[in-house]
């Protein structure tokens, strides 16, 4: 039996049929830029309906925001204006007559990385349209009471919040070019693009420094679309971090980019199976 897993972001939707730690099939769709909740819900229903099979035992969804993980109710969603606080899991359960779970996308990314890499104490940080983190303590996902344990993008920084400087928003706002375009230019050796990523790395160091003071993880794994630019910002990040963090805390810390393109989908399947095993379904 497989789990149909969804990773819903601000610009794209990833789906996969997942069996254990194996992705059987994957699909990608652009998320409609305009529209209301009804239109977005219809979009999700259409995508899910296209890929449900008799072997599918349930649906697991990651979203960028806070979730009541017991009921699957969305409490606050970031970067998807058409998705309000709503009982998304129950609505989909009623539609497809199957079990549905919902969790924060960064939580599922971290859970997937922990399962694939056997990490016991780590942060999985997603760098995409926004910023989020999943926290793994002693091999278990820690979400906090309101699924907000990793909402580090909302930390105060400069003239706003740190997400504005540590996500794809930084490049469009401060360099007036997309992160994808700057990545291509950096690959060509363009000095302006390389400098933009160096500055990005310095901002990211400030965010990581704050998370180290709170969580003190052994490993930090970066995911999300911006993480593909890891080689262009890691040195600036490390250099800045040395001036911000107590030396021994950095001695055995590893910071790396994810080697698993769909870790969040693996994490979504694992989350569903954990809920199923603990008899959370009615």
What are these regions, as identified by a protein language model?
Residues 31-33, 82, 149-151:
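A short acidic/small-residue loop/turn micro-motif
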Residues 1-58, 69-71, 92-98, 113-123, ...:
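ATP-binding/phosphotransfer module of carbohydrate and carboxylate kinases, centering on a glycine-rich
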Residues 19, 63, 70, 137-138:
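A cytosolic small-molecule/anion-sensing beta-strand core signal
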Residues 27-29, 78, 145:
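Short hydrophobic alpha-helix segments
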Residues 58, 62-73, 77-78:
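Gly/Ser/Thr-rich active-site cleft segment
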Residues 7, 60-64, 103, 124-130:
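Short beta-strand segments
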Residues 76-81, 100-113, 125:
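Glycine/small-residue-rich loop that forms an oxyanion/phosphate-binding "nest" at active or ligand-binding sites
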Residues 120-169:
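Glycine-rich phosphate-binding loop of actin/hexokinase-like ATP-binding domains
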């Amino acid at each position: 039996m497989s789990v149909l897993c969804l990773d819903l972001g601000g610009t794209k939707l990833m789906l996969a049929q997942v069996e254990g730690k194996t992705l059987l099939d994957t699909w990608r769709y652009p998320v409609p830029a305009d529209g209301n909740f009804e239109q977005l819900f219809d979009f999700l229903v259409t995508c899910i309906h296209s890929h449900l099979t008799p072997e599918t035992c349930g649906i697991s969804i990651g979203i960028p925001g806070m979730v009541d993980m017991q009921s699957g109710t969305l409490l606050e969603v970031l970067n998807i204006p058409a998705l309000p606080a709503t009982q998304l899991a129950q609505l989909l359960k009623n539609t497809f007559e199957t079990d549905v779970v919902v969790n924060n996308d960064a939580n599922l990314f971290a859970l997937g990385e922990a399962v694939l890499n056997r990490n016991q104490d780590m942060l999985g940080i997603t760098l995409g349209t926004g910023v989020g983190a999943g926290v793994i303590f002693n091999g278990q996902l820690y979400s906090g009471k309101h699924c907000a344990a990793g909402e580090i993008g909302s930390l105060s920084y400069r003239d706003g919040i740190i997400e504005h400087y540590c996500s794809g928003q930084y490049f469009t706002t401060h360099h007036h070019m997309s992160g994808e375009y700057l990545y291509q230019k950096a690959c060509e050796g363009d000095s302006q693009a390389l400098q933009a990523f160096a500055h990005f790395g310095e901002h990211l160091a400030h965010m990581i420094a704050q998370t180290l003071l709170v969580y003190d993880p052994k490993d930090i794994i970066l995911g999300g679309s911006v993480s593909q630019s890891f080689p262009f910002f890691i040195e600036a990040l490390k250099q800045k971090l040395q001036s911000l963090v107590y030396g021994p805390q950095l001695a055995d810390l590893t910071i790396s980019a994810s080697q698993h393109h769909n870790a969040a989908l693996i994490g979504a399947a694992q989350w569903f199976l954990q809920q199923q095993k603990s008899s959370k379904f009615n």
